[in-house]
Amino acid sequence: LKADEMLKPGVVSELWRKFTEYHTSIEFYNEVKYIFKDYITDIPNVENTLSPRGWDNGNDMIGTDCQTVMHSPIDFSSRTPHIDNPREIYAGLLYMPYPEDDSTGGEFQIHRSVGQIKRVNEIGGREVGVENQGSIVKSVPYKRNTFVMFCNNSSNSVHSVSKRENATLHRRSVNVIAEYNRVAKKSMFEIEEFRK
């Protein structure tokens, strides 16, 4: 579910509604901006132009989202090395595996990149070409109450999700993001995107 549904009365529990409300709020955005400081550009009167996706008035500069996600228990990487949408400002991932989930893998992996990434296939999930894929420099385990967040300030912010092994249960997580809406005509970095 995405924030546009989770914020509607009666769709989810009050606890989940409040969780979503906070993580799509100007208060949360400002907390993240404080952490990442100069990596996130100041927007004048940001409190008047930020709203959860699906709740804006059509000309808000920044959209926020809080999404509950379930990936099927298939034994292959659910996400190869890629970069995110250049309009995305930040992304956070909260892992919520079932207590009885004894699978391995499903880790969030941060990659070193080789050279400057200049071009990606938008339809292909912005997967990074083999020539730009470097070694994994950090892995964040898929375990309960683990949260990882990054500022999407570079076309070299390459990350992936490792292959899950012996998975019988869905991989559960919450995505928390903010991104520039198209009306803002802004992005965090420049990159050529093609559709193939």
Residue ranges: model-predicted function:
Residues F76-S77, P81-E88, Y98-K196:
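Catalytic core of Fe(II)/2-oxoglutarate
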Residues K2-M70, P81-D84:
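Signature of the catalytic double-stranded beta-helix
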Residues H71-D75:
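Short amphipathic alpha-helical segments and their helix-coil junctions
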